[in-house]
Amino acid sequence: MKRPDYRTLQALDAVIRERGFERAAQKLCITQSAVSQRIKQLENMFGQPLLVRTVPPRPTEQGQKLLALLRQVELLEEEWLGDEQTGSTPLLLSLAVNADSLATWLLPALAPVLADSPIRLNLQVEDETRTQERLRRGEVVGAVSIQHQALPSCLVDKLGALDYLFVSSKPFAEKYFPNGVTRSALLKAPVVAFDHLDDMHQAFLQQNFDLPPGSVPCHIVNSSEAFVQLARQGTTCCMIPHLQIEKELASGELIDLTPGLFQRRMLYWHRFAPESRMMRKVTDALLDYGHKVLRQD
């Protein structure tokens, strides 16, 4: 069985994290040549490339598996060392999360863990349809995803659902929908998406109003919080989690444009198996809080 030297795995990890050999060398406090030699040693051991030499470099499928192995080893080392870690650098936990979870329930869920445990969070924001890929590539140790099936050597639990409402301000609704929300009126009403791959509003409008993708004017804004601001100021109509705008809906600052119609996104928590002691704390915190505030039906 091939047993890689974890120094060489750390070199591979550094090249990916630092997006190049030069910065990886600086991070590891070794020469760039030494980084190249360590990766070449790994590639010779496995008889195949582990990096695609693009700019920035990216791992091959085998490279992804090795990075995933490194993440598991780092977490298990923390558990094995236990109290001997006291006073050392806090453990780094890299998690892939969707922006709407980050803007609503995730940070309150993690508050007890952050208060009681010496950890550093590296929260990587990605669409919930793509977070699991970061776990597959070994970039993170846990992911909030809409995928219900676990990856090999991983665990998965249901967190609950976010219900997205199609909302706007009252002045916006009066301007664009004086006769109600209709297919023809929607063609002129600007919406907003998180990025070019965010298709939630397109799916909602196609399903309920038979509007094909790309038929309505759309802003691109990479911020969940900005969605709320844009809607409040009367700039757009948009899909926002009910959990994020409960106060605005109660006060009438925002209105549900299509009562009874919504998009539901069921979320799942994925992580490597076996779990370290610290990851078990994170899992318990996320599941406990998620089951309280997210839809469970």
UniProtKB/Swiss-Prot annotation:
Specifically cleaved by the protease DegP. Cleaved ArgP can no longer interact with the oriC region in vitro. Cleavage may play an important role in the control of the protein availability. The keyword Cytoplasm does not apply. CDD domains: PBP2_IciA_ArgP. GO terms for molecular function: bent DNA binding; DNA-binding transcription factor activity; sequence-specific DNA binding. Residues 21-40 bind DNA. InterPro entries: ArgP, ArgP_gammaproteobact, LTTR, LysR_subst-bd, Tscrpt_reg_HTH_LysR, WH-like_DNA-bd_sf, WH_DNA-bd_sf. Keywords: Activator, DNA-binding, Transcription, Transcription regulation. Disruption phenotype: Null mutants are more sensitive to canavanine. One of its GO terms (biological process) is regulation of DNA-templated transcription. PROSITE patterns: HTH_LYSR (PS50931). Residues 4-60 form the HTH lysR-type domain. It holds the Pfam family HTH_1. Belongs to the LysR transcriptional regulatory family. NCBIfam families: argP, PRK03635.1, PRK13348.1. Homodimer. Controls the transcription of genes involved in arginine and lysine metabolism. Activates transcription of several genes, including argO, lysP, lysC, asd, dapB, dapD, lysA, gdhA and argK. Acts by binding directly to their promoter or control region. ArgP dimer by itself is able to bind the argO promoter-operator region to form a binary complex, but the formation of a ternary complex with RNA polymerase is greatly stimulated only in presence of a coeffector. Both arginine and lysine are coeffectors at the argO promoter, but only arginine is competent to activate transcription. HAMAP family: HTH_type_ArgP. This is HTH-type transcriptional regulator ArgP. It comes from Escherichia coli (strain K12). The lineage of its organism: Bacteria, Pseudomonadati, Pseudomonadota, Gammaproteobacteria, Enterobacterales. The gene is argP.
